[in-house]
Amino acid sequence: MDLTIIISGAICLVAGLLVQTYPEKQIIMTRNTDKFLSLGERTDVANSVKLQKDEAVIYVSVHVNASLDKKASGYEVWYLSPGYRRTVLDKSVAQDDKSLFPILNSLMEEEYTTESILMAKFIMDGLQAQIGNKSKSRGIKAEEWFVVRNANMPSVLIEVGFLTNQEEAMNLNSDSYLQKTTQGIYNGISAFVTHFERSRGFTTKK
């Protein structure tokens, strides 16, 4: 199954590594210029990807955190709360029997949740292995953040650290630390892709 990978946010080097490793795959950045895109525009880019039979797409948003608590620190990976209900399928999939649509949509939501959690775990493992004791893991969490709520595909939001924490801000401006963070995210996505392809894809066509 062919997989399209969409990268949004702070660390564009991740996309570069993915392009090198997967030249046959479509790697999309939600922006490749300095023009600011709203969160809605970013998820619109993701949702506009047209899938053919045996194709799938994932969305990875990379963000830098901030807090009123200047001591807050660490990195975390978010996925959409499993209890949040939304429409992820085109209603044409059940045009012959509309009563089937809620069932099919619910099944797809569950698939997306499973894949999002798995992707989050792989990425967290990658970050922990690369960053070590330079920063702390805040864990994998579920919430209804805009980017994971509005991307109709398996998706995660990665918060790489707090700019409002003086020490962490210095780390995030360090080339060596950014390289480790980039490598950790890349390793996690790559591990997910490998798992995905070995299982021949575990999401049906949108």
What are these regions (language model features)?
Residues 2, 8-206:
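Active-site-proximal helix/loop segments of hydrolytic enzymes
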